[in-house]
């Protein structure tokens, strides 16, 4: 019985390159990494975050003065996993240009907005969605109260950071993230989540 990850890895295309030493084959994502392109696809969770962080650190060590391009197609996910990626993006020396392909929702939208100002893009038919962090903790009443307090603290911190990245007042961010708030690529530009809609490679 094959699990989903086995099937997924079997479907990743291989690229053959001619080199002075003969042929070399790469999976498509490794080949794109050579071009300083990282794909953030699917749910944001700890394992994926560790891989993204490792790639960011590797590309910084390779060329600290060259931009990194982070392509995002994600419904969001774990706040702590997302913050590991976000903090690394801010920490490393290269500028991280973010590009939304498909969708950037929840933590995906936050990471999109966290790219280098002036280098954050959406493709024309992509969608962006912002909202408040979700809580699903179960347990004793006192523990639930502790987790509720933690979520409120995280919500306020994320809103402050989103306000900083978009240039929107905190009160507006608080109101607009109270419920799921979907935006087209153009609306995401107007809101300040990204800087431009990219239709053709320049």
Swiss-Prot record:
Biological processes, Gene Ontology terms: protein quality control for misfolded or incompletely synthesized proteins
Subcellular location: Cytoplasm
Catalytic activity: Hydrolysis of proteins to small peptides in the presence of ATP and magnesium. alpha-casein is the usual test substrate. In the absence of ATP, only oligopeptides shorter than five residues are hydrolyzed (such as succinyl-Leu-Tyr-|-NHMec, and Leu-Tyr-Leu-|-Tyr-Trp, in which cleavage of the -Tyr-|-Leu- and -Tyr-|-Trp bonds also occurs)
Protein name: ATP-dependent Clp protease proteolytic subunit
Recorded GO MF terms: ATP-dependent peptidase activity; ATPase binding; serine-type endopeptidase activity
Quaternary data: Fourteen ClpP subunits assemble into 2 heptameric rings which stack back to back to give a disk-like structure with a central cavity, resembling the structure of eukaryotic proteasomes.
Family classification: Belongs to the peptidase S14 family.
Entry GO CC: cytoplasm; endopeptidase Clp complex
Record's keyword annotation contains Cytoplasm: yes
Matches recorded under PANTHER family: ATP-DEPENDENT CLP PROTEASE PROTEOLYTIC SUBUNIT
Enzyme Commission designation: 3.4.21.92
Protein origin, superkingdom: Bacteria
Keywords: Cytoplasm, Hydrolase, Protease, Serine protease
First-listed, main subcellular location of the protein, grouped into a coarse class: cytoplasm
Known function: Cleaves peptides in various proteins in a process that requires ATP hydrolysis. Has a chymotrypsin-like activity. Plays a major role in the degradation of misfolded proteins.
Active site feature: 106, 131
Enzyme class: hydrolase
